[in-house]
Amino acid sequence: MPVITLPDGSQRSFDHAVSVADVAASIGAGLAKATVAGKVDGKLVDACDLISNDATLQIITPKDEEGLEIIRHSCAHLVGHAVKQLYPTAKMVIGPVIDEGFYYDIAYERPFTPEDMAAIEKRMMELIEKDYDVVKKMTPRAEVIDVFKARGEDYKLRLVEDMPDEQAMGLYYHEEYVDMCRGPHVPNTRFLKAFKLTKLSGAYWRGDAKNEQLQRVYGTAWADKKQLAAYIQRIEEAEKRDHRKIGKQLDLFHLQEEAPGMVFWHANGWTVYQVLEQYMRGVQRENGYQEIKTPQVVDRILWERSGHWSNYAENMFTTSSESRDYAVKPMNCPCHVQVFNQGLKSYRDLPLRLAEFGACHRNEPSGALHGIMRVRGFVQDDAHIFCTEEQVKKEAADFIKLTLDVYKDFGFSDIAMKLSTRPAKRVGSEELWDRAETALADALNESGLEWEYQPGEGAFYGPKIEFTLRDCLGRNWQCGTLQYDPNLPERLDASYIAEDNSRVRPVMLHRAILGSFERFIGMLIEHYAGVFPAWLAPTQAVIMNITDKQADFALEVEKSLNGSGFRAKSDLRNEKIGFKIREHTLLKVPYLLVIGDREVETQTVAVRTREGADLGSMPVAQFAELLTQAVSRRGRQESE
């Protein structure tokens, strides 16, 4: 007689084993219809699974995060059902859930086309309308093998081989189609109505380019059609903001096949880049950092000593010269330790903060490259703080404050902070981990802001703090990091003279605020849709004459503004003023200055914003003051 305890503390007794669905039905017909699965003693199970002993139970519905994930996973199985009906010779591989959706990898004799994707989606809708039950059968291993052998599902058989200890497996039947999964899955296709297939791509078996190529069908699924519509609208907005598209429109950069994953910065984009670099240079100088520069190409010996060669060699670009092996640096930290090691260091020299706008190169797979967001050549606002263990908390607290201030300057105020703690495989004593985690946690607490733990997600040598920004579309971008590291100083023999004249290893804090400049600029482009705040805009003001008679004054204004440190250009083309205004509005120039006869006579400029606001005529000095205020606000709102 199982006694079922519900989340509100109420209990229900049964005189026999009972399924999750039966418990839901005993509560009410509405809940029974909405039941996707259950959580029994904290473990997710199918709605059809039986509960034989006393247990706690949470009914999972589409409103729950777990329910939504189950819907997405079941939609992947539905893709399999539709594909096997339309393309019987296709072989199904895997269909996992991903962020906001799912995909299914499929082996087929030819690449799928957009027309194929439309046909698969149409068949999925037809199958959903049949309103059939999804049937789960726990099946002995030998029978599972027989099922997939009979169906010619070679990849499923390989997956079974990967699980030698599993003697029974869950098979989920969508009518004649069967798939293997740990589950749980929806009990009926009625839960799958709010879905859409989104794109096709190639993939490789087990993610290895040496293996056979597969087709990957991506999709998204939601609890209801309202949520689906909101998601589609968000995706459409994201497509409009695609940094690759805007980068071309605003003449910021380009990429080309001859240099995969390397950015060709155009004048406009390089201006944005330089503004970022000069801003970060000033921030670091004001906060006690020394800027250094280290070599691009370093002997293999250093990478072996640092441990990167054994763990990271396949991602490094290498070369040989005069019987020596070299690597283009994928990161700056070993080189910064070399700078620290030059000359004897005392405890009085600590903390020592070394910063570099370090150009790094990593041999990322070509399929992983994405515009300027994921590249092979990039520059980081990289710095390393060498300090005593007692100084860690203050250095971390100062870094947290600095990082949040920088993000505000770029217009980001929704920041999530997470502390990743010791993983199962780690080096160092428990006492050292305790002290390191406590120091970082105390520093986070000093910020007065919310943060959360990520248990087990730290590096094998130390805990770390991660900063994740949420942009205007609600997307999360992990940018800043502070990594506690006693390991690299040990490997590279860094030390300082302590107060008692003993040699002691410093703690090394790896830190970055923006991360990769390339990726951060891509984020800014999409966050602002190219409508940069005045301080970041490649051109801050354009001066336009109505007729040739005003050309000389327009050039005077341009010279005056540029002489004051602004970025201004004049447009003296023999075009209608309305045409010029429209063109520069589309180019997202913050301020449009129009000069006619009256402005020449009064030595003023007629000021418009790219949003269409008419600010009226004013002396150039007054406009310069207005622009100064806009630039000084950076990305902050006037109220901040």
UniProtKB/Swiss-Prot annotation:
Residues 1-61 form the TGS domain. Binds 1 zinc ion per subunit. It catalyses: tRNA(Thr) + L-threonine + ATP = L-threonyl-tRNA(Thr) + AMP + diphosphate + H(+). Keywords: Aminoacyl-tRNA synthetase, ATP-binding, Cytoplasm, Ligase, Metal-binding, Nucleotide-binding, Protein biosynthesis, RNA-binding, tRNA-binding, Zinc. Its main location: cytoplasm. Residues 242-533 are annotated as: Catalytic. Its EC number is 6.1.1.3. Its cofactor is Zn(2+). Zn(2+) binds at C333, H384, H510. The keyword Flavoprotein does not apply. It is an enzyme of class 6 (ligase). The keyword Protease does not apply. GO terms for molecular function: ATP binding; metal ion binding; threonine-tRNA ligase activity; tRNA binding. GO terms for cellular component: cytosol. InterPro entries: aa-tRNA-synt_IIb, aa-tRNA-synth_II, aa-tRNA-synth_II/BPL/LPL, Anticodon-bd, Anticodon-bd_dom_sf, Beta-grasp_dom_sf, TGS, TGS-like. One of its GO terms (biological process) is threonyl-tRNA aminoacylation. Homodimer. Belongs to the class-II aminoacyl-tRNA synthetase family. Catalyzes the attachment of threonine to tRNA(Thr) in a two-step reaction: L-threonine is first activated by ATP to form Thr-AMP and then transferred to the acceptor end of tRNA(Thr). Also edits incorrectly charged L-seryl-tRNA(Thr). This is Threonine--tRNA ligase.
